[in-house]
A protein has these predicted regions:
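N-terminal export leaders
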Residues: 5-9
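Bacterial Sec-exported substrate-binding components of ABC uptake systems
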Residues: 22-105, 216-243, 367-378
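A short, structured surface patch at a secondary-structure boundary
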Residues: 59-156, 162-168
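Extracytoplasmic ligand-binding site segments that recognize negatively charged/polar headgroups
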Residues: 103-105, 120-131, 171-174, 189-206, ...
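Proline-aspartate-enriched helix->loop->beta-strand connector
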Residues: 152-168, 184, 291-304
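Structured C-terminal subdomain patch of bacterial secreted/periplasmic proteins
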Residues: 194-223, 303-378
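Flexible, glycine-rich surface segments
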Residues: 234-315
Length: 378
């Protein structure tokens, strides 16, 4: 049985509990003589993890939804006795990581942590991050199978210290269980379940703790937040915007109103046309609309953003209209205000602020050039 963070803390022996500089009115994790609570890592946006810091450099990372616990332990620190079996101990430095969750790679790059990854769940040609692709082509990172079919022999031979998965692994739980039977810790990261872009970006602190680069993570996160500060002082542009793609079965795939892409449109000063679309009983951030409903909601949008991730890049208006003839009647198509995301966008987790700044230029400039993640559909 998995223990929650609260259950873990309650399970520590009462005979050795100590208070570590906290007043009686504060709610803080209990401490033991071997694991003495110091402080909780402050998080401004993220809700899918917590980090409790203990004396001696120990940090307990908790995945809030699953309740999974990971005790990050400094290289030369003593082993903590009496931990519940549900706590996974990760002793630094964590080497030979099997990285399956592609959104994590860009955060590792920002922390200069690429050398800790030696196994990938994505082939070289599947990476849009130049450094990751180059590392695979040079043989510094090897392909070790996708999430549902790990190459156990290769993973074991590499002396893998940690497998980093996303929640897709829950579709094939036997793969996760087999890795754990081989003694390989499995961490299922949940950054994609954060509702906002800055909450996703704040996972930089999670990986900074894991890699022993907390200060760098704090500095980089603060720098990214600061870059957005000028936009908060500006009035909304009034530009209405849709973010979509046309599926193979003639539906419009759009983001729900609470999704982080919708929030980025708002942060950039725009109005997301499907802001009222809410959760329809699943945890997906997208939903498919009949073309008639999409037409009704987005026909008068000032800006159209085409999502290239699944259905591919659209270069021209002719290509776009070939996917859906109704689009020829859209205001943004007729005015030439249609943009397509680059295919690298969803792997570049550190680029969320850049994307917001790109959007702001689209909303405020007549014909912005040299955007990082948007290309004009001519």
């Amino acid at each position: 049985m998995k223990l929650t963070r609260q259950q873990f803390l309650k399970a520590l022996p009462a005979s050795v509990l100590l208070l570590a500089g906290c007043s009686a009115s504060e709610t803080a994790p209990a401490s033991t003589e071997e694991l003495v609570f110091d402080h909780a890592c402050p998080l401004d946006y993220a809700t899918q993890f917590t980090a409790d810091c203990y004396e001696g450099g120990y940090t307990m990372l908790t995945l809030t939804d699953s309740g999974e616990l990971f005790l990050v332990t400094p290289e030369d620190a003593a082993e903590v006795e009496g931990l519940p079996e549900s706590v996974t101990v990760l002793r630094q430095p964590i080497r030979n990581i099997y990285l399956v969750s592609t959104s994590v790679m860009d955060l590792f790059l920002a922390l200069d942590g690429l050398d800790s990854v030696t196994l990938s769940g994505t082939r070289a040609e599947g990476w849009y991050l130049d450094e990751a692709r180059a590392a695979m082509e040079a043989g510094r990172i090897a392909y070790a199978g996708k999430y549902s079919a790990p190459d156990y022999e290769k993973i074991l031979a590499a002396n893998c210290g940690l497998a980093i998965e996303n929640t897709m692994i829950y579709h094939t739980p036997e793969a996760k269980e087999q890795l754990e039977r081989f003694g390989i810790p499995v961490l299922v990261e949940r950054s994609s379940y954060e509702s906002g872009p800055l909450a996703r970006l704040e996972w930089l602190k999670f990986w900074g703790i894991l890699l022993g680069k907390e200060e760098l993570a704090e500095q980089e996160f603060a720098r990214q937040v600061e870059r957005l500060a000028p936009l908060a002082e500006q009035a909304p542009t009034g530009k209405r915007c849709a973010f979509f793609s046309i599926t193979a079965n003639n539906l419009a795939n759009v983001r729900k109103g609470g999704d982080y892409v919708a929030q980025m449109i708002e942060m950039a000063g725009g109005d997301y046309v499907f802001a009222d679309l809410t959760d329809n009983g699943n945890n997906l951030s997208t939903m498919n609309l009949p073309l008639e409903d999409f037409y009704a909601g987005a026909k008068d949008a000032d800006v159209l953003l085409y999502n290239s991730t699944i259905e591919g890049v659209v270069h021209t208006t002719e290509e776009l209209v070939a996917k859906c003839s109704l689009l020829a009647e859209f205001k943004a198509v007729q005015s030439g205000s249609v943009w397509c995301t680059t295919q690298s966008f969803f792997q570049q987790s550190m680029a969320l602020v850049d994307f917001v700044l790109d959007l702001h230029r689209v909303f405020t400039e007549d014909d912005p050039a040299d955007l990082q993640f948007l290309r004009k559909v001519e």
